[in-house]
């Protein structure tokens, strides 16, 4: 199996390095990742400057672009041979609910799906037990490849930040959602000018049983199938009826 591995935390992030090590025990892995942290880059592509892949001594590549750039360029540019699967992660921090809209981790997987390949995104609810998340992924891939992963979807996997032995199991979940993130951090630069930082994500507002929030909070791996089609199908008919009533 040939796997393209990327992330949004950057090529030197602990999560992607641990996952690459474990995946290489059973697969041919090509790692192409941003040269720095590109968290929350979503599916943005770099269109106003050239992309420069740098091949490192160990054969991995870093790129001066976004996670989506990495997957797009690797699959359309410099990689030779057939890729069987795109994997993105391990992200430092969960991508639950509305997070998937902003997530570069999820976007890298979606870019693989756009280009016709099965793909998964994996995130850890913290920064400690990356080995747990890597083990989960390595156990799931042989079971999923050639079956679920052939659909026009990606799988968004979130793992609790606990030792592997304490994980209670795996649950298939739908996305929850967060409250609005209204906090902005205002500071001053050395010249006294105002500068701003985007604050933390909103708290979980829907973490009922069946959501990804609930699963991870209670010690389960959450797997959510995600599709790029964001059409609100349940509203199509009511919208059509409204237009025709005018």
From Swiss-Prot:
GO terms for molecular function: 3'-nucleotidase activity; 5'-nucleotidase activity; exopolyphosphatase activity; metal ion binding; nucleotide binding. Binds 1 divalent metal cation per subunit. Its main location: cytoplasm. InterPro entries: SurE (IPR030048), SurE-like_Pase/nucleotidase (IPR002828), SurE-like_sf (IPR036523). The keyword Cytoplasm applies. It is found in: Cytoplasm. Belongs to the SurE nucleotidase family. Nucleotidase that shows phosphatase activity on nucleoside 5'-monophosphates. This is 5'-nucleotidase SurE. It comes from Pasteurella multocida (strain Pm70). The gene is surE.
